[in-house]
């Protein structure tokens, strides 16, 4: 272009370019100063590379046109790829890993999912408020540090279910934050130094890599912890681990998961903490605005727990946050590059691949947009009625288009909540009234050295605040996250009425959920759902004999992924006449996207009408920024849609809406198929669970349950428990054979596993409920694996295992699955794998509650096996114990009674036969039922012979099971207890004894006395413990006849 103008800027020096023009501590402010001098577009040279900056709304509006420009990863962000690689924030344009992650994660950040995170956000925000309240109003608060703690804890808890508990360490920031701050600062430094200078900064490079590894190690630990979780929650981390890309069908690699966990932890807290810090700086600097904001919170919320509906009714708080981000965008810029050579602003030529930096602190103060007072803090300019009038792309603190921040809704809800909660609770004053704002720069910006004091408002106290938060926690959710899927009672079969078709456009799942809800409501009114599908399914396929309801939204000004074909079809102008089609449109949007608010719903509505379709009802709308989407849908349904349908399409069986029976569907329940494989199983419902041990001790649990029917159980008897395999083990199998959990497997031949023939079974159900996955491989299994091995070295190693089978495979419990993972060259069909697995068997546990103690109830006391595998790598998870540990109150499981051997029951004459019970750890279970049965006899005033319990464990505060309950039984005269503590033998009641064998020696006289009275001795525990006990007693008592010395070894 001959008339293209040279881009202005300071003259660069040889070698160093403009490096000397940049303040190393305040580089951003130096660059902003260039904007004042050189105008809306300027360039500087750093490290021999030209850097262009745009500083006006008009230029930014051009640069945000995704048909011409796409994101560029430059300077500090490019250095940050050492940490996060192709994570959402640092990926190059078009990177495949970014595409997979983006498509998987966008639905997980939909408005309904974000709203359901409000309770966890409130939990952390309450921790902050309690800390400030307990410190008192005279304490100087480093607000930026506390907001960093808050936002880091919030993102970790809400997206990954991981508690960092940063507020419990007030001395230092979390190690992740310390590493992050160094990496962000160093990335900025490296980006502004010549390559040769960076190459000689050996110590800084080494420290950089050390901090990167520390952050990746923490992310890896979070992932590993989740994979151990037997009941993972449906959160963002679960989506990362298990989500599938709808385009490629692939999941995310482990490296990509780590990259994006780190991206969330950084991007999810760093910018939000800066936003909150600047917001409160501005509020304290403008007391009249602070007062007005506080009045809005008082009028809307009062002292109630803040709900999602409250947040939608705080427009002034919303405006304050927008204005704070306008003046101090905490992520101060983003870069784009043209897809081909472009002319910018009508006069500057930008070559393809040349990055252009959008300098937000300058753009967002453009006086041509925000007026002569653009440098001043005026939230009123950001109220909805003014915000909607701004020119396109005037406010871009969250980036642009498909590379914009997908966590925007999360950050905004969190910021609204925290501002509202703090204003609800405190009056704020500056710690130093003379403080002048200083900016701390890394790749983001925050106030430096800003401190406040927080004084409790309206007579509130720290104790009262604590009590209020506990009441909220006890009473349940404060958020508007009600379950919109009402319970189906199935009292009546559905009648066939007027059919209705529903089509939706949905990226995040919100409009899809609304469509399902509306279809459910319509069914309850006598209509029949004919179709419920994405809009693209409606191309050339709109029915004419029934109403068509469309629910959709706009995504970055464009149709959602599943509505693009439909909109393109309407826009061609070649659509056949839609005459005879009756339709209604319901649109969702967010008023912050002023230029594209409801664009696609309006477009569809207009184009269908122009093509001859009949508009049944006025278009419905829901603004996600200020309302509850489901409530808006319901209101439109009642006031617009239903009246139109009744007038034009009255269903043949029209009924009134019954909220207790919304679906009017008929259903039946049956027991799981796996239950039919075992005779005599009884259904049980868990009524109570608790952990009996301290966190740093191998876990033991108590599980109480109720059941119906007579089982003829007696103290000392057993239960056969029908378990399922640990989810983490099942996931290993699915990954090994590249199966999704809901893949169907159909067995078409007879099998010994009891699998249904010619009936599809999901892969997760098959491997969870029907087969043993951790059984040691047999010799025949090894032969088959050797034959299926492609690698000669692997074949040799497998032959070595075969030759040493007993010691390496059998004794170390190496399974077929372990071998498949260890030797990837084995090519084993899944049918062959299944044929190698034995059927899943029941596991036996002792009762720990006497049937007479609480009729129709019982309990189990068990150790949860989660220990390093004997094979030398990985974890060994006990199948049944981990299954039982996953159950919660209300859970259903299945058992069958199994009598103990006759001698392992209480004496037939309890009044004349003393008993001595000896056990360690969970071996206490049967003896607890013995003692309870004796307690019942005691309460019936029946005489009892003496009973001694010798119980061994690690220590009083570690795993002294049922200490309080046993003490009560002892006080009632039912039993005398003698303890041994292996870790704390000097504890008074242990009498210096580490093991029960030692305690038997100290009580020798009492044992001899009881033995002479024809006592029965019962022993329950491990083989080693039982051998030690037997040796002591034989030495003390002589021969031990089996009718008087009864053991149960596990």
Swiss-Prot record:
Cofactor: FAD; FMN; heme
GO cellular component: cytosol
Cofactor remark from the record: Binds 1 FAD.
Family statement: In the N-terminal section; belongs to the cytochrome P450 family.
Organism annotation: Aspergillus niger
GO molecular function: aromatase activity; flavin adenine dinucleotide binding; FMN binding; heme binding; iron ion binding; NADPH-hemoprotein reductase activity
Protein name (Swiss-Prot/TrEMBL): Self-sufficient cytochrome P450 monooxygenase CYP505E5
Binding site residues for heme: 405
Entry function: Self-sufficient cytochrome P450 monooxygenase that catalyzes the regioselective in-chain hydroxylation of alkanes, fatty alcohols, and fatty acids at the omega-7 position. Performs hydroxylation of C10-C16 n-alkanes and C12 and C14 fatty alcohols; and thereby enables the one step biocatalytic synthesis of rare alcohols such as 5-dodecanol and 7-tetradecanol. Converts 1-dodecanol into 1,5-dodecanediol as major product with very little sub-terminally hydroxylated products with the 1,4-dodecanediol and 1,6-dodecanediol more abundant.
InterPro entries: Bifunctional_P450_P450_red, CysJ-like_FAD-binding, Cyt_P450, Cyt_P450_CS, Cyt_P450_E_grp-I, Cyt_P450_sf, FAD-bd_FR_type, Flavodoxin/NO_synth
EC numbers for this chain: 1.14.14.1, 1.6.2.4
The Flavodoxin-like domain, residue ranges: 500-641
Span list, region Disordered: 467-491
Enzyme class: oxidoreductase
Catalytic activity: 2 oxidized [cytochrome P450] + NADPH = 2 reduced [cytochrome P450] + NADP(+) + H(+); an organic molecule + reduced [NADPH--hemoprotein reductase] + O2 = an alcohol + oxidized [NADPH--hemoprotein reductase] + H2O + H(+); dodecanoate + reduced [NADPH--hemoprotein reductase] + O2 = 5-hydroxydodecanoate + oxidized [NADPH--hemoprotein reductase] + H2O + H(+); tetradecanoate + reduced [NADPH--hemoprotein reductase] + O2 = 7-hydroxytetradecanoate + oxidized [NADPH--hemoprotein reductase] + H2O + H(+)
Transmembrane segments: none
Name of the coding gene: CYP505E5
Residues binding FMN, per UniProt: 506-510, 585-617
Domain FAD-binding FR-type intervals: 679-907
Key words, A-Z: Electron transport, FAD, Flavoprotein, FMN, Heme, Iron, Metal-binding, Monooxygenase, NADP, Oxidoreductase, Transport
Record's keyword annotation contains Electron transport: yes
